Amino acid sequence: MADILRRLTNSERCRLLQDKLDDWYKDYHINSCDSNLNVCCELLELNSKVQGQLFKILSVTAQEGGQYAGVETIKSRFLPWLGTCFSTASPGSFSENSFVTLNESMERKLSTSHERELNEVESKLSSTRIELNSVRQELLETQMDLEDTKTKSANTLLATEEEILQLRAELRAAREKLELRSLDSIDEYERQIRLLKDEISILSSESSILKSRLSRSRSPSPIRHSSRSSSPFARSESPTSAKLTSASRQARLISRFNDIFANDRLDAQTLLRRYIQDLDMVQRIIFIATVESFHSAKMAFRQFRLRVCKSLSPSHMGPESLEDAVIDYIVGNLDLYDVQSSVNEVISAMNVNPKISFPPEVDFILISGFIQEVCRVAFTMQTLDPPLDIAFTVDGELFTDSKYRRTYDSEHTAPLVYYHVWPALMENDNVIVKGEAVTKRGALWNSIRSRSRSASPLRSHSDSPGHNLTRSRSPSPRRSGTPRF
């Protein structure tokens, strides 16, 4: 019996019977008499099938209870119902009066709906006639406007000989002005060509100078240390850098920034990998060194500009502003920048950075050459208008495709940055060069755990007083012959 009841429960007949009843209730007044009778017959058929299964369940249930089980229940429930059924009217119970009444009500409803539809059609017809009349009126007005236009065009074509001569004279004058403008533009183009040729020659000479410096730096001769002058005006201006346009200097700096990422960064990474096996920590060290180098170079540029402005302001004369004169002087004397002080500041800041952990035998002086190059480029970028700077970064920030590229070992579906490999170069709010970042799922939680672990780094900062003294006084080597901007 349980199987029969389960099949009845899973069957769609009861639900289909209810759906058909709902649909019949909605469409009863729209359907015809035959359609309503057909729907009623379908419902009776479905009901008979459901009743057949219910009677089968009733029979099985009674058999399970024994020979006389359930007799009283069946008598009390079915005998009154069977008596009521037998006392009902015969199959011809629908009298003619009910059919007549139903027919009259349907006719009244149909006549009402027909009149309503007829009124709607008449209103639409009247509105269409009004629109047609308005269109005809617009057509007449358009024809009148067309006639007026034709008349005016005919009058315009009847120009006199004097007007034609005047137009010809104006045409000759316009041609002469155009020729003068073309000559002026040609002169301007020639002047720009001469400037570009001069710039190319300057760049060529500077390239030869840089090549000679590079060849001397590769020679086995000892490194020469040049002493820095205390005054920013102790050296003469560099004419090659001063004559370059801002766009050319920006292009060179962007190229040098990309070259540092492609070459110097990898050299520093290879050098650190000899002592630190963790590639993630090595990349973090290089990224933090780059960020600190930009910060130190910007601070040094502000101080240098204040000193130059203070020195030039008493004797400044000429059409250009004092700020332009200061920038021109800095561009022409970039070698006066004390890059070694910035390198020392960067190394000091990295020694107390809580995100870095490394063995005690490793010193950041190993990558002082890389820091030196980044400081030079960052300092020179401040002389541009507008200056170039790196983007602000936070571990666990949302990854942005327009600002960073994912590394090859990143999880490309991860939305957060695990750590940054290289910063993005910005001009105001515009991305000039994309940076590089590692994305992993759970980056925010991993960054928090890495901070908590780095609170006790592998390298102990309190080994001995002598060790700290040696590290604080250890000089950073300078690279001679390094190209400067």
Swiss-Prot record:
Residues 112-210 form a coiled coil. One of its GO terms (molecular function) is cardiolipin binding. InterPro entries: MIEAP, MIEAP_C. Pfam families: MIEAP. GO terms for biological process: mitochondrial protein catabolic process; mitophagy by internal vacuole formation. Residues 214-244, 451-485 are annotated as: Disordered. It is found in: Cytoplasm; Mitochondrion outer membrane; Mitochondrion matrix. The keyword Acetylation does not apply. Keywords: Coiled coil, Cytoplasm, Lipid-binding, Membrane, Mitochondrion, Mitochondrion outer membrane. GO terms for cellular component: cytoplasm; intracellular membrane-bounded organelle; mitochondrial matrix; mitochondrial outer membrane; mitochondrion. Its main location: cytoplasm. It comes from the Eukaryota. PANTHER family: MITOCHONDRIA-EATING PROTEIN (PTHR21771:SF2), MITOCHONDRIA-EATING PROTEIN-RELATED (PTHR21771). Key regulator of mitochondrial quality that mediates the repairing or degradation of unhealthy mitochondria in response to mitochondrial damage. Mediator of mitochondrial protein catabolic process (also named MALM) by mediating the degradation of damaged proteins inside mitochondria by promoting the accumulation in the mitochondrial matrix of hydrolases that are characteristic of the lysosomal lumen. Belongs to the MIEAP family. This is Mitochondria-eating protein. It comes from Xenopus laevis (African clawed frog). The lineage of its organism: Eukaryota, Metazoa, Chordata, Craniata, Vertebrata.
